[in-house]
């Protein structure tokens, strides 16, 4: 029950205009008043947290350092924000064919990796979530919640993250 209270408190803060300090320096009028992309950025910042040298190869808000990238610890919040937005934009482009659902899919992929959704053509098949969307079925809440495992075990905090992403980014009216 305490975890549910924390989640409700977090959502209350976001809806009422309070956001974690590190997540945004601007004054918010509630997360629902923000454009969906900005909501996604705040959700990712909140759940990824700040990655330091001990989290290598991740830096900032969960950017995975790629071969050839000249990134050194520590980085500024501005650099981390820029990396997050660049990564999220690339993921949105990857899921562009899913139109209104591309941002939600990009958020899941930011956390799990795009291969978990798209499949890798070898061992990992295309996800049931994408197969449903391909069939025109947008009843995907349960499928979104399945992306909550780490090393095969369900993780409650990741499940809460999926719940928040779905409720703040999914538009059922489309």
List each language-model region with its residue ranges.
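Positively charged n-region of N-terminal signal peptides that target proteins for export
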Residues: 1-7
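Sec-dependent N-terminal signal peptides
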Residues: 7-16
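Long, amphipathic alpha-helical surface segments
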Residues: 21-51, 63-67, 75-94, 115-174
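Surface-exposed patches in mature extracellular/periplasmic domains of secreted proteins
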Residues: 52-56, 95-104, 143
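Early exported N-terminus immediately downstream of N-terminal targeting peptides
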Residues: 55-59, 63
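Short N-proximal segments of mature Sec-exported proteins
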Residues: 102-116
